Design a protein with these regions (language model features):
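Outer-membrane beta-barrel porins/channels
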Residues: 3-11, 21-182
Length: 182
């Protein structure tokens, strides 16, 4: 609950909502030799799936900023297949893809913003409005890991890592709804 100096109060209990998908991470890796592929144990493949944001916020229609937003959702999923190779004992190289998408399997599968129309353009004030959209975009990443110093047991004491991630731009395709109508 919040009350400003003028006495306007906003209460929010998220209406029982939980961010869908919640910020979460799932990682799987496997050494190719352990999978029976090749004889070298210096190559590993991996797959990561996570939701980097998991954003869901709601405010009551009576809030002082309802003409700006009453609900915002950003249900993005990042799928990252990758491969890593260790050409030298102290150097590892990694390459991977970043696939950003909105999935209907989790939530509504779109970026969404809802608000109350302030009035004008022939739309009555207070009409529920919704902007939404979805897309899929891809990027890539490359990384290096250098271990210049190890202890007597061969465990790393110092690791130096570098990573590059390319840009991936989502060009949202969606709709504007006024009172539930396109």
């Amino acid at each position: 609950s919040f009350q400003n100096g003028a006495g306007t109060q906003a209460n929010g209990d998220l209406r029982g909502s939980v961010a869908v998908p919640p910020p979460s991470n799932v990682y799987m890796t496997a050494n190719l030799k352990d999978l029976g592929i090749g004889s070298s144990d210096s190559t590993t493949i991996g797959l990561a799936v996570f939701s980097p944001f998991g954003t869901l916020t709601r405010w009551p229609d009576s809030s002082p900023f309802s003409t700006a937003t009453t609900k915002a959702a950003f249900e993005l999923i990042d799928i990252r297949p990758s491969i890593a190779f260790r050409p030298l004992p102290d150097l590892a190289i990694g390459l991977g893809a970043d696939i950003y998408t909105f999935s209907g399997a989790l939530g509504e599968g779109q970026v969404e913003r809802q608000f109350r129309w302030p009035g004008g353009l022939g739309i009555p004030a207070g009409t529920g409005m919704e902007l939404n959209g979805r897309d899929t975009a891809a990027g890539f990443n490359a990384s290096l890991l250098y271990t210049p110093l190890r202890n007597g047991d061969g465990r790393p004491l110092v690791n130096i890592g570098l990573i590059y991630r390319s840009q991936a731009t989502l060009h949202l395709d969606g709709q504007l709804l006024a009172g539930g109508t396109r």
